[in-house]
């Protein structure tokens, strides 16, 4: 059976692993998932994201989660644009999360980036998720 929303699956795996205190989490590889994980790393929500070569030439992404005083750094991880309802925003309407304390991850024509980088680049795109 095929998965309908692999990005939502990735986000749920990260959220569930963080809520029970796991040090890391693995999920199947895709270029979009890796780009999202690298944005999370760059923004300081996770320690590391790396590609692990698995059996039968299938790769996984391993994310090392980050905790502060025993609590997960990622408090909110919400999928916005989904397969049944896509959410697109122009450069003027890019959403801010918690008044700028969190980030929106946007898929643009220039790649996957945060809402602030999309504003700097002057591009809009599909709002993939909110992180805080």
Curated annotation (Swiss-Prot):
<keyword id="KW-0687">Ribonucleoprotein</keyword>
<dbReference type="Pfam" id="PF00410">
    <property type="entry name" value="Ribosomal_S8"/>
</dbReference>
<dbReference type="GO" id="GO:0003735">
    <property type="term" value="F:structural constituent of ribosome"/>
</dbReference>
<dbReference type="GO" id="GO:0005840">
    <property type="term" value="C:ribosome"/>
</dbReference>
<comment type="similarity">
    <text>Belongs to the universal ribosomal protein uS8 family.</text>
</comment>
<protein>
    <recommendedName>
        <fullName>Small ribosomal subunit protein uS8</fullName>
    </recommendedName>
</protein>
<comment type="function">
    <text>One of the primary rRNA binding proteins, it binds directly to 16S rRNA central domain where it helps coordinate assembly of the platform of the 30S subunit.</text>
</comment>
<dbReference type="GO" id="GO:0019843">
    <property type="term" value="F:rRNA binding"/>
</dbReference>
<keyword id="KW-0694">RNA-binding</keyword>
<dbReference type="GO" id="GO:0006412">
    <property type="term" value="P:translation"/>
</dbReference>
<comment type="subunit">
    <text>Part of the 30S ribosomal subunit. Contacts proteins S5 and S12.</text>
</comment>
<keyword id="KW-0699">rRNA-binding</keyword>
<keyword id="KW-0689">Ribosomal protein</keyword>
<dbReference type="InterPro" id="IPR047863">
    <property type="entry name" value="Ribosomal_uS8_CS"/>
</dbReference>
<dbReference type="InterPro" id="IPR035987">
    <property type="entry name" value="Ribosomal_uS8_sf"/>
</dbReference>
<dbReference type="InterPro" id="IPR000630">
    <property type="entry name" value="Ribosomal_uS8"/>
</dbReference>
<dbReference type="GO" id="GO:1990904">
    <property type="term" value="C:ribonucleoprotein complex"/>
</dbReference>
């Amino acid at each position: 059976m095929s998965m309908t929303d692999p990005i939502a699956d990735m986000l749920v795996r990260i959220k569930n692993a963080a809520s029970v205190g796991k040090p890391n989490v693995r999920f199947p590889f895709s270029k979009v998932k890796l780009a999202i994980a690298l944005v999370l790393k760059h923004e300081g929500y996770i320690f590391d994201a790396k590609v692990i070569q698995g059996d039968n030439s299938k790769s996984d992404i391993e994310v090392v989660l980050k905790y502060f005083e025993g609590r997960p750094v990622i408090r909110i991880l919400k999928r916005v644009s989904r397969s049944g309802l896509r959410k697109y925003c122009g450069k003027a309407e890019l959403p801010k999360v918690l008044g700028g304390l969190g980030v929106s991850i946007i898929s643009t024509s220039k790649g996957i980036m945060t809402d602030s980088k999309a504003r700097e680049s002057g591009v809009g795109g599909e709002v993939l998720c909110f992180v805080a």
